[in-house]
Each structure stands twice: as C-alpha cells, then as structure tokens.
Amino acid sequence: MKKMLFLLAFATGLNVFALDNPSGHKMISYKLWKSVTKEELTKKMKSNKVPTALIKVRYDVDIYDVTYVSHWHDGTPVLASGLYYVPKGITAPMPQVVYHHGTRTRKGREEHLGGESYLCLGFAVDGYTVLMPDYIGLGYGEKFHLYQQYKSLGQASVDFLFAARELNDSLGIKANGQLFLTGYSEGGYASIATNKVIQESYSNDFKVTAAAGNSGAYDMGGVQSEVMFKKYSNPHYLPYLLLGFNEVYKIVPDINAIYNPPYDSLIPEMFGKGSHMGDIDRILPEVPKDMVKDTFVQLYVNDPKFPMHKALADNSLCYWKPENPIQLCYCNKDEQVNYKNAIVAHENMKKLGAKHVTLRNGGRKYGHYKCAIFSGMYTKLYFDSFRNGSKYGRKGNLNKRFLLALAKLAIKP
C-alpha cells in the first residue's frame, strides 16, 4: 500500500511525508470531468417541470474529478475520490457545500449526470462550490465501503475538504468561510456524521455554518434496526452493513458464515463483483433476518453483549449535541428510511442542549425517491438564509416556499 502511494506521490509531486502523517491531507490529482452551461441546466429543469423561479441559474459550472489521500478505519492512508462543482466566472469568495450521496454498491462513476448530480448543480449554478465525496471504497478509491459508519464517512469528507483547499489555490477559487453539509439517504446520515467528526476532531480546521440531513438512518440501534424483522424493499442494506461492521468490530471470524444457504455464497459473490443494488435485492429474502442463521438472530435478540449492539450504538447519530444549526428533513411515507429517525434524533439532540436543531417535513405522502426532490429544495432555502445573513437559519424565501407548496399539491406520491 505505502509503496503504491509512494510511486503515486513520486509521479505527481505529492509530499511523501503527508502519506504517513495523519495530519497531512493532500490532493493527488484533478482533471476537468464535465462542463454544464446555464442553458443546458435550464432546459433540464423545464423538461422535469421544475419551476425556474425556485433556483437561480446564474453560472455555468465546471465539474472536476479529484483524487486525494484519505484514511482507512485504522488510520492508514488510502486513495479516495470525489467530484468538485465550481461555478465559472466568479472572483468573489464563495460559500462551500459538501453534498453526500445516497447508497451505492458499485465502484467507479457513471459517465452521465444523474439525479444527485443535479442537486449539486442546483447549488453550484447559484454561486456555491460543491464537493461530492465518493466515500472510502467507492468511486476510484481503495478498499471497500464501510456502510453507515460515521467515522469513515466523516473522514472521507474532511480529507476532501483539506484537498479542496489545495485545489482552490490551483484554480484561483476563494472560500468565504461558510461551510454547509447536506446529503440524502445514506448521504443524510453522512452529512450529520461529517458534522460530528468535524466537531469532535477538526474544530480548529473547519467551522460548520449549518447542516441539513435528509432522510438519514440516524437511529441505527433503534428505529432503523426494526426493518430487519419485517418485509423491506431494500434487504441488501443488511449484508452491506454487516460487511463493514465486521471489518471494524470483528463480530464473527467469517461474516459469510452467519448466512443461511444459498445466501452464504450469493452475498459475497454479488458484493465482490460490485453488483447493482437492485440486482442484489432480487436474490435476497423480503424479510432481511431470513438470510441470517437463527443462532445469530437469537444472539442479537437475546444477548445485549453481542458485538453488533456496540457497532450500532457507536454509529447512531442521535446522542450528541451539535454546536451549529441543523435541519432534519423527512417524509412520512418513506419506505426505506423510517421517518422516525429524524424525530428521535431531533428529540435527543434537544434534550442534550442543542438549541438550533429543527425538523422539516418534506411531504406526508411521499416515499423515499420523491422525498429527495423536496428535501433538496428545502435544504437550498435553508442554506440560502445563512448566505443572506441569518445566524441560525430560516425557512427561506416566502414566495419560493409557496411555489414548493403548490408543487407538493401537484406531484403525486
């Protein structure tokens, strides 16, 4: 590993000291990936019936593919990657957003712009720079993804922020000091994870202006764990979670030994070749626990010292006191992430003394996918209020909120 990093460092001029020093966070390389014009984005918005009055399309955007050094869970350096969205033609300092994407099981990157890319563009065309980390083990990075583990997710984002400082110098970009964190689904969880990691370990390096977690599974050991015992639309979440948890917490010597046949061979094959989430779901039982041997299910149910409980508790994000404002958005009919995750997180953060944590209902009738549209819009309004001078955040422009309300009436579940 270190030999390969050394060769990369030699080839790219990266300071070799940074690879062995946990405090050294360095960009390895970047290249222009795509450019998007105002006209292209406006056309896309109109084709999807998004009111252009909701988003100011003011700038063309360059998107850079960035490779940088991050860290594995044991602190050793690993390669990581991400995309950096930069508005063109701005010389004034700009606010910065870290957008955390939802669950992915495949490495690499689609060559076309997908749904979450347009959420990033929604910020960038209005004058925000946007980082979208691939997370450890995804994109073009090394190792495998430690799904729903807050320290790994947060570390990938923090290291990307350090790398972006260097890239800003190369591109002549200035930051205005405002840092916003957001994301959806696993990304909603990851945005709050990054907030926690910065507050715990990097408060001298970064100051979070505000975070907006959208449809995140924050209550890992509580509300979200209940899906294991009932019919669930995305059963692949369980083996994905167990794969990463076993790497860090050593729950069992061989994680594949806990599965009933034929899942004991199908699961490592599907995850090993980076199958699409839908393909994995099709070979798994509707009730997630049915893929696991009953002896392990009973250990989980009856033994509070079973290591899985510690793994879930360590990675629940409901029991800490954020120092900066946070908005938690949810939708009542979300079939993948129980909306009560946001309720529980909000209640416990307030109990611990957090003063500026708010709830936002993205829609009582929407499921997981349509909730992403409205939670993204509410996040933009929330972040804009800080850019416009609010200290603790507001709901946003009244006219735009009215347009959103009309859209919610028009768009079916």
How does the language model describe each region?
Residues P322, Q327-D334:
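Short beta-strand/loop motif that positions the catalytic acidic residue
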Residues W72-S81, Y85-V125, Y140:
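Short, surface-exposed "cap/lid" segments of acyl-processing enzymes
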